[in-house]
Amino acid sequence: MRCIIKRLFQNILTRSKRGSADGGSAEALPPKSLRQFVGGAYKEVGAEFVGYLVDLCGLQPDEAVLDVGCGSGRMALPLTGYLNSEGRYAGFDISQKAIAWCQEHITSAHPNFQFEVSDIYNSLYNPKGKYQSLDFRFPYPDASFDVVFLTSVFTHMFPPDVEHYLDEISRVLKPGGRCLCTYFLLNDESLAHIAEGKSAHNFQHEGPGYRTIHKKRPEEAIGLPETFVRDVYGKFGLAVHEPLHYGSWSGREPRLSFQDIVIATKTAS
C-alpha cells in the first residue's frame, strides 16, 4: 500500500506544480480557502485514503465510487490517477463553492468524475441548509456503486443521522460492494484512554447516544459507541471486516490513521 500512496502523491504533486507553472491546469489544487475545511494535509491525506480504498476495499480501476462529503476533491484528485475510463466517480457535498471548483477543474478534464451539491442542514457548516440529514436521499439509483466512502463525515453527525446514511449506503451499494467510513469509536479502551488524558479529544459532554467535545456545538466532533455502529451495520446488511482499524486519536498505538476506520461489505440480498 505504501507504494500506491507514494505513486498517487507524486502524481498529485506533479500536477499541482504543472498547474502553477502554466497559470492553472485542469488539475491544479483548490485554493487554501477551500482546502482549510477538509482537515489534515490535503495532498497527503488524499493519497493516504485512496491507498486504503485500494488495499483495504480492493478498489479496482474500472469500478464505480461514491464519495459522500467530497469537499474540494481531496480524494477525487488522486483517484483521477487510478480509475480508468471504465471507472466512475460521484461525489456530493454541502459546500457550493467546493463543488463548483471540482466541476470546473476536475470534471472538465475527467467527464467520468461528477459532483453535486447537497443542500443539507448542518449547524456549523451549512446552517441555512434545506434538507435535514434524516430526510436526505442520496441522489443515485439502488445498487449503483462498487465502493462508497466517507472520511470525517460521521465524526460530525448524530446517531439517527448516521443510521440513516448507513441505510442509504447499503441501498446504493451493489451486492458485494464495499464501504469505508471513519469514526471516533467509543469502547472500553478508548474511554479508558480518555479518562487517563491520553486522547486527542476528551469527549467529556454526553448527548443522547453520543459524546462530544463541545456542549454548545456538538457537531464539532462526535464520538459514537462502537456497539451502536456494529448494530447498525448488521441491521442494513453490511458485514464488518475484522479487525477494525483503530486510529491514534484516542492514544492507541500502533494505529493505521488518525480516526478509526471501519470497512464493510454489502451482503447479497
Swiss-Prot record:
Gene3D superfamilies associated with the record: Vaccinia Virus protein VP39 (3.40.50.150)
CDD domains found in the cross-reference section: AdoMet_MTases
Family of the protein in this entry: Belongs to the methyltransferase superfamily.
Keyword Methyltransferase annotated: yes
One example GO MF annotation: S-adenosylmethionine-dependent methyltransferase activity
Keywords: Methyltransferase, Transferase
Tagged with keyword tRNA processing: no
GO BP field: methylation
Lineage, opening ranks: Bacteria, Bacillati, Actinomycetota, Actinomycetes, Mycobacteriales
Pfam families, per the entry: Methyltransf_11
Enzyme's top EC category: transferase
Stored InterPro entries: Methyltransf_11, Methyltransf_Superfamily, SAM-dependent_MTases_sf
Protein name per the record: Uncharacterised methyltransferase Rv1498c
EC number: 2.1.1.-
